[in-house]
């Protein structure tokens, strides 16, 4: 079964996120559990936790259908020790918030070397950052998102994702989220079913489908291999509809959150309905 949704707002309270997801016909959703532009947030109080859990139950969202995202400020591969510690503390806080909310996944961007340390050293720092957080939490999987490779961001090659996983001690609590826009911008072709087969065969060989814990379904304004991160609405960008139809018809993408981060929230309900309709092999554009 496919879990399909979008990254919804938690404005006004975390309990509003499941309601907003249900309003657009979603069977999955992503959210920030705190302001993503701030390092710290007030601790979660029991009422907020209870209200969120009640809302998830009311709208029929299990933890397997929810893919929270951490703060964009965090850099788990930071070359400067003091800044690295700040990021590690913030990431641990994000993991603990998920644990309190009964969530089992936390999606994050791996990190950046900022042109100051070697790529290998940065990847090792990211893995160690994950180990530190996992040692102090229970039940939450750290889900590494592939990047477009913009600037000095790592995680844009499958080999880099595999290297991070290799350095994580508890393999049962590390996973990957593949963003289609990021993959395309990083040079993984998705424009035809044949290209999708090739790209995901490579993913399966290098990373392994056992680590796939979520996806971000985004078309790309950016050009193939450009290493520029610019999302677009489904079918409106340089990837086109075929990739998303192909994903909907492949059982390897069942049972994980498939989350839209496309640029027009006003048509998320339409995009979700279209994705649901593509699950039939008879589906056409």
UniProtKB/Swiss-Prot annotation:
Domain of life: Bacteria
GO biological process, one term: base-excision repair
GO molecular function terms attached to this record: deoxyribonuclease IV (phage-T4-induced) activity; DNA binding; DNA-(apurinic or apyrimidinic site) endonuclease activity; phosphoric diester hydrolase activity; zinc ion binding
Keyword DNA repair carried by entry: yes
Matching Pfam families: AP_endonuc_2
List of residues binding Zn(2+) 3: 182, 229, 231
CDD domains recorded: AP2Ec
Cofactor(s) of this protein: Zn(2+)
Cofactor note: Binds 3 Zn(2+) ions.
Role: Endonuclease IV plays a role in DNA repair. It cleaves phosphodiester bonds at apurinic or apyrimidinic (AP) sites, generating a 3'-hydroxyl group and a 5'-terminal sugar phosphate.
NCBIfam families: nfo (TIGR00587), PRK01060.1-4 (NF002199)
Family: Belongs to the AP endonuclease 2 family.
Annotated HAMAP family: Nfo (MF_00152)
Protein name stated in the entry: Probable endonuclease 4
Biological source species: Salmonella arizonae (strain ATCC BAA-731 / CDC346-86 / RSK2980)
């Amino acid at each position: 079964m496919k879990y399909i949704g979008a990254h919804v707002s938690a404005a006004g309270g975390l309990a509003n996120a499941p309601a907003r997801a249900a309003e657009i016909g979603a069977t999955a959703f992503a959210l920030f559990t705190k302001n993503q532009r701030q390092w710290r947030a007030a601790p979660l109080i029991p009422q907020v936790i209870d209200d969120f859990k009640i809302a998830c139950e009311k709208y029929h969202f299990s933890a397997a259908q929810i893919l929270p995202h951490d703060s964009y400020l965090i850099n788990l591969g930071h070359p400067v020790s003091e800044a690295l510690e700040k990021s590690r503390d913030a990431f641990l806080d994000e993991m603990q918030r998920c644990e309190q909310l009964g969530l089992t996944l936390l999606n994050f961007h791996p990190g950046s070397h900022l042109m100051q340390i070697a790529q290998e050293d940065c990847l090792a720092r990211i893995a160690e950052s994950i180990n530190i957080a996992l040692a102090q939490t229970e039940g939450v999987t750290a889900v590494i998102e592939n990047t477009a490779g913009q600037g000095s961001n790592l995680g844009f090659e499958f080999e880099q994702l595999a290297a991070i996983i290799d350095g994580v001690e508890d393999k049962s609590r590390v996973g990957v989220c593949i963003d289609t826009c990021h993959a395309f911008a990083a040079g993984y072709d998705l424009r035809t079913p044949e290209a999708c087969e090739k790209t995901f065969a490579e993913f399966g060989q290098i990373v392994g489908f056992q680590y796939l814990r979520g996806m971000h379904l985004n078309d790309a304004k950016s050009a193939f291999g450009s290493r520029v991160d610019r999302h677009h609405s489904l079918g409106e960008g340089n990837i086109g509809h075929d990739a998303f139809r192909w994903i909907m018809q492949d059982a390897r993408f069942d049972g994980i959150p498939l989350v839209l981060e496309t640029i027009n929230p006003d048509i998320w309900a339409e995009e979700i309905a279209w994705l649901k309709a593509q699950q039939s092999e008879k589906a056409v554009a």
